[in-house]
């Protein structure tokens, strides 16, 4: 449901995703992979999420985790904190998800620093106000990209994470990876639905090249 201000409300139905069994996840699924991204809604099936995380680690993959929704965090908070202790290389959260995880109100940069305290990269997205990215003592405020018209925020967080991962896995700095994430998120919200139109990708790829 999209309101005139471009904001969306979703009631999630996971469908066939909830029928997947941990036994269906095998080392062969990660052959040749160097990174595994775990999307938060998988955490409604904790046994499957455990198998994905453990198998990815055994295959030598780095791991990123997208918290996806404060509702996900409310259900899977213990699992998330346990995985952070084990070691998650990159965590993506927005302000509501970080608040639910740490169960306190704090400044957005404080959430990023606390997440980074687990040893990985923390990306705390704050919508139209940009994001904070932290790793150890390294800390960056990622500026938002202005948009001509806000149409639909569905998928913006995923686009941001996708841009960041694309940059990071190709060796870009944290700041440059965050800038690419911000650009993809900004492009996403200007279109109805979560997909960025094909004709926009040459410009976005050129931006990624320019950031290297």
Label every model-predicted segment.
Residues 45-53:
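Active-site-adjacent beta->alpha loops and helix N-cap segments on the catalytic face
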Residues 53-62, 68-141:
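Conserved phosphate/ATP/ADP-binding segment of small-molecule kinases
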Residues 48-49, 76-77, 200:
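Residues at alpha-helix caps and immediate loop-helix transition turns in enzyme cores, especially N-
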Residues 117-124, 128, 145-211:
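Conserved post-catalytic alpha-helical subdomain immediately downstream of the catalytic base
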Residues 14, 144-145:
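Residue-level structural signal for beta-strand termini and adjacent loop
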Residues 1-38, 205-212:
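Conserved N-terminal subdomain of the carbohydrate kinase-like
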Residues 11-12, 33-41, 61-68, 92-95:
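Short beta-strands and strand-loop turn motifs
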Residues 5-7, 15-16, 41-43, 70, ...:
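Short glycine-rich anion-binding loops that position phosphate/pyrophosphate groups of nucleotides
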